[in-house]
């Protein structure tokens, strides 16, 4: 095609002719059989392409280079006879006379740091019983999400996890762990089963940069939002990153263990950008997979140097192929999309349709961040809050309106929210309870489209935020009774609201990062889950546990019925109190005929009127499990504790 500038390439890639002549709908990547392996690579602008063969994934010489044959739509391929399992390879792609050695964008396994791709017989990576592993059935009433990094989950020595498995996939498979082995306070998988969450959302588990898999991990740390290979797991989370099949098998073992515990697995996916511009996609088809400005320079809507061009046909195919692969090969139960606002609406809806077409695919969750990390060249409908009405109703969004209303803005550490007494914020609490279905701000198709939360891996932990609002110089490791009460109130609001409840791991035991708001590459010690705090704040853990169970006992709060929030009746109360009632849906198995809920963000007790009838106290400011016993029944009026969410059930 001749030497082209980035601006000329942009014009070419966005032309109808290029799309017509190069769009390919067939399989790409390695196709293994015992008799041989077919490799396919989409590289329509290449003049030449070859495969380089290696015996090892690192520190070994090339044992041969073979030319690939060009076919229609720019797909290059080669047949490698014989059993190729365990062999490593790269491609050399020549464009405009420049040869680049690169990994396979569709590789299913890789060597150290993912620099070489690996041919793998996936059947040999299946853990025992994998063929019987199925996605757990989690009804909407039981859906809740607990977000954690694989590394954070178990790297604390107090976790009780065997040393070789700390910070690894296999930590999720170890049962019976307790704090310092005390046999009393459960940690890790046993802790999760007791807590009662429906899903674990794993921060990026695909192969990422910024952690050198060839070096000890004692001081290395990264969240993983630096993708290098999208279709196989991160090696630093495996016990042997040099052997490509190990990371695949151990990732599957983790998923199987969570499934056996009745917990679904949601994968945090970061297709919106890649770690470096020199990557497996750009080395294969220069500038195709990433948006450019008009002058050909890179658009940077991710804030990370580049952004994925989801609207281009083969980029869209790549993203959807990858999602389908993880759903089918790894039995993933849901996907969380980082910076979802960088994808176009059509791609997100196409991904939803593709997942729906899988057996059981309609139960696979999809939700994401409906914003971008900077100005973007995506000049069509972005998958953001403004275009929520254009997204499939089973594509959800993180609701920063709910987050900020409850605890205050995330970009100003000292800005209060409702639980800290911000004047006028009670109006937004009503919107949050209804999952904004009764608001003009961002009416969703259904309440289940709203992810209700107050903390995630980004920004301050809830505990740190509460202390920053209360004190100019907080002591983050000190206990604080008022902050604990405000923490319980925050949980009491979003766990009694419509929508999909979501929490950062450790929020339920006052997790602190000592005021660090962006710990993506801070020390492992700062990021780890401090399991001693789960013991220290066991009463707070039990408060979350009780609310999660209470929510499951009143299914209407988790409903997918778009009209359900219309049944909410709000009371006219003295500001800033908020109160409401909600009848149970007919035949949904609710334990109570209706709920009556009050929020009190003040430092004094308040008396409120109750609707007619008898109301059993289910939860108050200190205990969320009163409903499990013979709790008191109230009529006409009730007393609200300071900084409290109080829940009654009609009897």
Regions of interest found by a model, annotated:
Residues 444-616:
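Loop/helix patches that line or flank the sugar-binding groove of alpha-linked glycan CAZymes
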Residues 35-39:
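Structural beta-strand segments of beta-rich domains
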Residues 43, 85-89, 630-651:
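C-terminal beta-strand-rich structural cap/linker in extracellular carbohydrate-active enzymes
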Residues 1-34, 70-174:
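The feature marks proteins involved in alpha-glucan
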Residues 109-158, 397-479:
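Glycine-rich phosphate/pyrophosphate-binding loop
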Residues 151-330, 336-359, 365, 376-377:
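Substrate-binding/active-site clefts of carbohydrate-active enzymes
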Residues 64-70, 218-225, 339-444, 507-546, ...:
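Active-site-proximal helices and loops of the catalytic beta/alpha 8
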Residues 41, 91, 148, 202, ...:
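Conserved, mostly hydrophobic/aromatic
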